[in-house]
Amino acid sequence: MSILEHISSPADVKTLSYEQLDTLASEIREFLVEKVSATGGHLGPNLGVVELTLAIHRVFSSPSDPIIFDTSHQSYVHKILTGRAGAFDTLRQKDGLSGYTSRAESNHDWTESSHASASLSYADGLAKAFQLKGEKARNVVAVVGDGALTGGMCWEALNNIATGTERNVVVVVNDNGRSYSPTIGGFADNLAALRMKPSYDRVMEQGKTTLKSLGWVGERTFEALHAFKEGVKSSVIPTEMFPELGMKYIGPVNGHNTKAVEAALRYGRDHKGPLIVHVVTEKGKGYAPAENDVAELMHSTGVINPKTGEPVGTKSPGWTSVFSKELVKAGETRKDIVAITAAMAGPTGLSAFGEKFPDRLFDVGIAEQHAMTSAAGLALGGLHPVVAIYSTFLNRAFDQLLMDVGLLNLPVTIVLDRAGVTGSDGASHNGVWDFAVAGIVPGIRIAAPRDDENLKELFAEALTIDSPTVVRFPKGELPSRLSAQQRFDDGAELLHYSDSDHEDSTPSILVVAVGSLVSSVMEIVSDIEECGCNVTVVDPRWAVPVAPSIVGLAADHELVITVEDGIIHGGVGAMINEALNASEIDVPVRNLAFPEVFPEHQSRNQLLDAVGLSPRGIKTQIIAAAESLYLLDKE
């Protein structure tokens, strides 16, 4: 029986010998490869924190001592040690184990959001709460890495943590030099310098021993070289980077030596007061396919062959790949086009552009706020920046979008990947807020393509507009192409109009279908017609602002249905309601959109079905709306 099979709580690892811990670490890595390869998930980050997580749970007393994992995609080992190994077959599945920490799963999990750079602020607040409640013996551990320290929020938190000299906050910097791809920026360079220090000091120590063995001449030579060494070291190695904030610093420590990490953490626990433990780890450690994945070290994978690391099944081209190719084409013809990524060039489709135009791709780290205002600066300088981020991360840069881009009416194109429902990535990764968030920026235009050809057209149009634009598309494979019957002057397209054979008295329904849900609407049009209604389907293409042609069409129908994969409050449907009211058009409207909830993780199709936005759900809601207005007889 393996050691892992005996682990059901953190207490079980506290009594193990270091030899047993090494065996357990190997067993955990084998377990992770087996389970994550079958479900998909964040494999590389978790392979890199096995010994670190073991040491944390041996030194601290979870859940009394909160352990906060920044982004928490590297919390799989933590889940294993807190009794959840048996649920890993359900990882990221409906009603199964979350891919991030989850308060519903365990009292060992204190947070749930998977947005980066927030852990230190949580830790600061928890430590203050414990201090005010007189719970001085409790520690707070924040594990931050995978590029999260490139986010400004971490430094805002550190500035506050450092002032709490009587608050027990241990900040573990999990330094693997990566986010998705290699971490960039001045802070990353500083950590690299700190990583360099131990070997540098070992060489100097050897030199000291040799020179002193030569008598007084050697001693004088050593003194001169020592003074030179200190001057060089202070200029290239930022040893005061953390102490200058008022925090004790320990490290770098080999993150794959459990004994060494444990010793550093015990010192941090007993130190009393804020402290940094700098741990150097290798993302993907122990699994050759991950170690050989130079680009991302298997940061996140789908279902893979555990022996080879290769994806299982054939992967069809997705939305991101179409955008990626179109951006490169645009860059070839226009030298003013530049691109910005917040540490996610690969996932957002910017890598190809960066390879072709390395001087025109700017990776700003996990810093969406800075990315947006930097884009504003590029636009002020006469360029047309394309900011490519996940839809859910646009929320982090709203003030910059509103005041630094919108207020100046600058030609910045924001491309939102993973817009709408994403599903298995969990509540905080769904991109359902972008219409409501970006839509209130005066003068902004938001495009929602329905297929690949539509995406190409709309992205090209966005690059010709001298004001802020957004192009949003979902995660996953592309739907079949849908041709339009007519394009109106404002860009909206008529996709379906019921046959003229129907009698004039037949009830008529206008369906405004947005983006990725257009194909779902078209799938059920004939079913609605068979129930006895004429149906008109229009795709606005540019969903914001509301196209005048849609307002005009609404006046000619007895019921308007809007269908979108964004939040219902403040979404496209709500904007159409306002436009109709402003034009004094009195027609019933039903908005089919994502409800105001944080949903549990499940597949995209499962989630769409759960909220009534699958083809079946859309059909049911349209028929119910028509029946409620007596446009159809109730069966």
From Swiss-Prot:
Origin, by domain of life?
Answer: Bacteria
Q: What is its EC number?
A: 2.2.1.7
Stored SMART domains: Transket_pyr (SM00861)
The residues that the entry says bind Mg(2+) are 146, 176
In terms of PROSITE patterns, this protein maps to: TRANSKETOLASE_1, TRANSKETOLASE_2
* Residues bound to thiamine diphosphate: 73, 114-116, 147-148, 176, 287, 368
Q: Does the keyword Transferase apply?
A: yes
Role:
Catalyzes the acyloin condensation reaction between C atoms 2 and 3 of pyruvate and glyceraldehyde 3-phosphate to yield 1-deoxy-D-xylulose-5-phosphate (DXP).
**Protein family according to the UniProt entry:** Belongs to the transketolase family. DXPS subfamily.
The UniProt entry, under NCBIfam families, shows: dxs, PRK05444.2-2
Q: What is this protein called?
A: 1-deoxy-D-xylulose-5-phosphate synthase
Q: Could you read off the lineage of the organism from its UniProt record?
A: Bacteria, Bacillati, Actinomycetota, Actinomycetes, Mycobacteriales
Gene that this polypeptide is encoded by: dxs
